C-alpha cells in the first residue's frame, strides 16, 4: 500500500531546501524567545515510520529559552487521545480569541475614526448602506474619538487601505484557528528538539507562540514525562 507521505514529500523537500538556503544566507539570526508552555505551530516535515510528520501544534518545554538559541524542545499536540498523552486546557481556537478579538476591536475603531474624520473634518458625504454600521460604531467609539489621532489613522486617504489589509489578515487567522476547535492532547512519548525555523506564522498578527497552556497542564505533563523517562 502506497503511503500518503509521498503526497506531501515534494512540498516538504522544496521547503527543506529553502530552509537550507536561508541557513547559508543568514547564518547569524536572532530568534524570538519563547516561554515554557507556549503553543507553537510547527512543520515537523515528512519523517520515517511512526515518527510524527506534517504540521501540528506543540507545547514548548524549555525553561530558559534565549533569542540566541535556534532550537526548542517540544511536545507535539494531537486531537487524538493516546496512552501517553496529556489533555491540554481549553481548545486552541478559544485561546486564540483573547488575541484576535482586540485586533477586531482595533479594526472597528480605526474604521470609525476614518469615516468620522472624513465626515466632520473634510467633507460630508452620503454613507448609503453603510450608514447603519456607522451609527453603531458611533455609539461604541464616539466617546473615545480623538480628531488628532483620527487624522493619523486617516493618513491622507490611505488609512482605509491599511484597515482593509488588516481585516484580510484577521480573516486569514480566523480561518486558520477555527480548524483547531477540538480538545487536544500533548503527546508525551513524542518529545522532540526542533529548529525554530520550523515554526509557522500565518502573518505578522498571528498569536502563535503567545498562546500558552496553563500551569496545571504543565504540571500534568511533568508528571507524565517523569513516569515515561525517569527511573524511580
Set out the residue ranges of the language-model regions.
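C-terminal terminal-subdomain/extension
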Residues: 1-14, 23-24, 32-35, 85-232
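Short coil-to-beta transition motif at edge beta-strands of beta-rich domains
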Residues: 33-46
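Short, charged beta-turn/beta-strand-edge "cap" motif at the junction between a beta-strand
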Residues: 45-51, 65
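Short beta-strand-centered aromatic/proline hotspots
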Residues: 53-64
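Short aromatic-glycine-enriched beta-strand elements
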Residues: 56, 69-75
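Short, conserved beta-turn/loop elements at beta-strand boundaries and strand-helix junctions
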Residues: 63-69, 80-81, 193
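Enriched for short, Lys/Arg-rich terminal
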Residues: 75-84
Amino acid at each position: 500500500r502506497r503511503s500518503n507521505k509521498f503526497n506531501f514529500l515534494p512540498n516538504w523537500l522544496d521547503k527543506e531546501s529553502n530552509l537550507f538556503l536561508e541557513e547559508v544566507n543568514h547564518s547569524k539570526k536572532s530568534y524570538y524567545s519563547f516561554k515554557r508552555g507556549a503553543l507553537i505551530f510547527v512543520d515537523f516535515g515528512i519523517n520515517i515510520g511512526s515518527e510524527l510528520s506534517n504540521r501540528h501544534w506543540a507545547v514548548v518545554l524549555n525553561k530558559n529559552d534565549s533569542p540566541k538559541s535556534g532550537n526548542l524542545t517540544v511536545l507535539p499536540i494531537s486531537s487524538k487521545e493516546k496512552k501517553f498523552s496529556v489533555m491540554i486546557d481549553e481548545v486552541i481556537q478559544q485561546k486564540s480569541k483573547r488575541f484576535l478579538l482586540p485586533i477586531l476591536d482595533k479594526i472597528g475603531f480605526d474604521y470609525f475614526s476614518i469615516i468620522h474624520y472624513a465626515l466632520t473634518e473634510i467633507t460630508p458625504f452620503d454613507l448609503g448602506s453603510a450608514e447603519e454600521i456607522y451609527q453603531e460604531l458611533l455609539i461604541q467609539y464616539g466617546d473615545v474619538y480623538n480628531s488628532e489621532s483620527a487624522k493619523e489613522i486617516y493618513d491622507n486617504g490611505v488609512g482605509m487601505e491599511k484597515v482593509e489589509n488588516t481585516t484580510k489578515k484577521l480573516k486569514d487567522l480566523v480561518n486558520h484557528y477555527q480548524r483547531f476547535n477540538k480538545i487536544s492532547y500533548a503527546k508525551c512519548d513524542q518529545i522532540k528538539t526542533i529548529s525554530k525555523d520550523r515554526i509557522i506564522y500565518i502573518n505578522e498578527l498571528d498569536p502563535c507562540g503567545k498562546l500558552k497552556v496553563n500551569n496545571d497542564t504543565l504540571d500534568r505533563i511533568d508528571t507524565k514525562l517523569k513516569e515515561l523517562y525517569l527511573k524511580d
